[in-house]
Amino acid sequence: MSIISVRNLTFCYEGSFDNIFENVNFTIDTDWRLGFIGRNGRGKTTFLRLLMGDYAYEGSITASVHFDYFPFTVTNESLTAAEILLTVSGIAEYDFWRAERELGLLGVDESVLPRPFATLSNGEKTKLLLAALFLKENNFLLIDEPTNHLDLDGRRLVAKYLKSKRGFILVSHDRAFLDECIDHVLSINRSTIEVIHGNYSSWQREKTRRDDYERGENSRLTAEIANLRNAADRIASWSDKVEATKIGGGPCDRGAIGAKAAKMMRHAKAQESRLEREIEKREALMHDVEYDERLKLHPEPYFRQNLLLSKDLSIFYGDRCVANGISFTLNRGDRIALVGRNGCGKSSLLKLLIGQPIAHTGTLEIGSRLTVSYVPQDMSFLSGSADDFAAESEIDITLFKTILRKLDFKRTQFTKDMSEFSMGQKKKVLLARSLCQRANLYIWDEPLNYIDVISRLQIETLILEYKPTMLFVEHDEAFVNDIATKVCRISLNQ
């Protein structure tokens, strides 16, 4: 057993005046399965990069283990999967049985080994690189959002695999995934970083309890401060009046009145000191309370009960049929989750519904004059200012920015080019645009990819409150269970 010690860590990016971390201190055991959580833009990936030695910083990070980062960058994807395994893991060819064992645990068929790495699916690449990195000796793995390219079955397999391992930091926003495979939580809060024993759910329960206590204390202290201020004002006003009566009075009167005024002034000073102490107590509170402000949505009712009908629909990639027999009816008020393995045509079906040219056969009936709000998976097109994006999208810029602020955007973020945003922040931009749009149907393609847990909960609350008609693809098991009124399972056509 060894530890990773972080002492007085301070860091900001070159050219920035805002510290990402300031005098941060904590200790990690290298045997822990540590979940790393926090809102988008708080510095999770930055901290992993600091551990890797990619940036200069103030303070110290000491460790007796070697850090490896996932996702690992493969520079030559023409190499076979087997060659990548050997190169990344550093194991000898006679030990290759160990690699095959790891792949078996991750549900990867050995038939992928002779294939060029470039031909593997994103899910297969994720699993192969995880296996390779865990085969390395005396390393501590920094795993940055491994679930983004995994379907639900893949997430369950990887969670089970990670649960069997020791010694890693895992950045993920998938609650069910975290609960399955971690035993400690490292949380970047609004003003502190904390480490606790337990999984995500135990951290969330403790966080909720503490936030509720601090809100209650804040309300109590606010009322106490108001009472003290009123009392201090009354005493000061009385003292001023008494001082005024001394003018023109006799010597005895002035002496008696002066003594009373002095006593009241001492009392006022005591009240003032107590007031300052109560204010300090209040200021010490609420530093880490997350403000998960309620979002709003404006779904437009459709004039018919039925919005969509799919019957025996088949989706093609070129000449290859990837899915067939897709049948479902979307009625007003339904929230249908499309569920299936990666590559089975879920995203293509959504693109087909918004009018993109997707090869297909079968019956697809779409209601006339149906207005749709669409959140795509792809975010690579986002660049320029948020103001220009809002104008191009024909949405209210004030409402757009208000929603982003509620999703934890800082005001300074709006001065940046969107190409500089984190992946989570880019996804929030697309979600905020959708929330600004009045629509009969909301079609969202993996809306929670890269989105932090607190924002996910805000979005869940929004949907359950406003009950929009939705068709969506999402691999977050907790979200699907909470939100979907129906599930349409799409099978991959082998």
Language model feature labels by segment:
Residues 1-218, 301-494:
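ABC ATP-binding cassette signature C-motif
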Residues 2-4, 213-321:
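Flexible nucleotide-interacting loop at or near the entrance of a catalytic core
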